[in-house]
Curated annotation (Swiss-Prot):
Belongs to the LEA type 3 family. The lineage of its organism: Eukaryota, Viridiplantae, Streptophyta, Embryophyta, Tracheophyta. The keyword Ion transport does not apply. It comes from Gossypium hirsutum. GO terms for biological process: response to stress. This is Late embryogenesis abundant protein Lea5-A. Induction: By water stress; in leaves.
Length: 105
């Protein structure tokens, strides 16, 4: 009898845990959009819009040239963004920004 009560407690606890997990679990999908569209309706069937979109994607990716946003710096050799301007020393920047006009009295 004691054995059946302990197994009932274990079974009840495991059912409660499974129910709690299923309620508190968030449903994020890991499937790519093509797999989702292909899963509805006939297996492997794609509509005209999806087929046209897939053809545009494949043709544009083949014609597109590869470019990276990072390029090696000619001075240091380290990689830095391509669109980054040249660095200016603080003293040079201060000299450019300060107005050196002498006021005549």
């Amino acid at each position: 009898m004691a054995r059946s009560v302990s197994s009932f407690k274990f079974l009840g606890a495991s059912v409660f845990d499974a129910l709690y997990v299923s309620i508190s679990r968030r449903g994020y999908s890991g499937a790519p959009p093509a797999a989702v569209t292909a899963s509805f309706g006939r297996p492997g069937a794609m509509g005209k819009v999806e087929r046209r979109y897939a053809m545009k994607e494949s043709s544009s990716s083949e014609t597109r040239a590869y470019s990276s946003a990072w390029a090696p710096d000619p001075v240091t050799g380290y990689y830095r963004p391509e669109n980054c301007g040249a660095e200016i020393d603080a003293a040079d920047l201060r000299e450019m920004m300060l107005n050196h006009r002498v006021r005549s009295q």
